[in-house]
């Protein structure tokens, strides 16, 4: 069970906003792994209850020396996520903020970007072994640049 909502708004040609939200209520109807392990009613592992993305983009054409400047910021959120059938280990809802500035001149585009600008600490993946639970942390605050050529 679940639903999704999408929204897009363009107040002026150069400015765009979008928002997407999804809710999932995914549970095992019946799942008895053994006589002592009954996961019936538990949430499915690795299926987030909520997904969220919000995005804003502003584009300037013929901006001085550049043919185009694009400024973008976006928020992405996930959670609660259970990592195994027993629903013991979980990641609560978290959100990361990302941004990018793109400068285009002719066939070249130079991007300057930042990811997880809020430095959100989260678990990207977790798994269970006989020796315990193991987790991979999400990516920290990251900055970067790229140069691309379109022809």
Predicted feature locations:
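Residues that define the transmembrane beta-barrel architecture of outer-membrane proteins
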Residues: 1, 48-52, 93-97, 106, ...
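C-terminal beta-signal and adjacent terminal beta-strands/loops
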Residues: 76-84, 102-151
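Gram-negative outer-membrane beta-barrel transporters
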Residues: 1-85, 146-148
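Sparse recognition of residues in long alpha-helices and their boundaries
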Residues: 35-36, 72, 89, 117, ...
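Alpha-helix C-terminal capping segments
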Residues: 7, 98-103
């Amino acid at each position: 069970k679940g639903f999704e909502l999408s929204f897009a708004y363009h107040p002026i040609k150069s400015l765009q906003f979008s928002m997407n939200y999804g809710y999932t209520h995914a549970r095992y109807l019946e799942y008895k792994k053994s006589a002592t392990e009954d996961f019936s009613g538990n949430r499915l592992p690795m299926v987030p209850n909520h997904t969220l993305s919000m995005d804003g983009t502003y584009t300037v054409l013929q901006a001085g020396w550049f043919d185009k400047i694009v400024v973008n910021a976006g928020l992405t959120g996930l959670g609660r996520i259970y990592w195994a059938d027993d629903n013991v280990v979980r990641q609560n809802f978290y959100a990361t903020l990302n941004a990018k500035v793109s400068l285009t001149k002719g066939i070249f585009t130079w991007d300057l970007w930042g990811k997880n600008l809020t430095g959100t600490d989260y678990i990207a993946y977790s798994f269970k072994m006989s020796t315990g639970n193991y987790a991979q942390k999400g990516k920290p605050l990251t900055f970067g640049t790229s140069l691309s050529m379109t022809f």
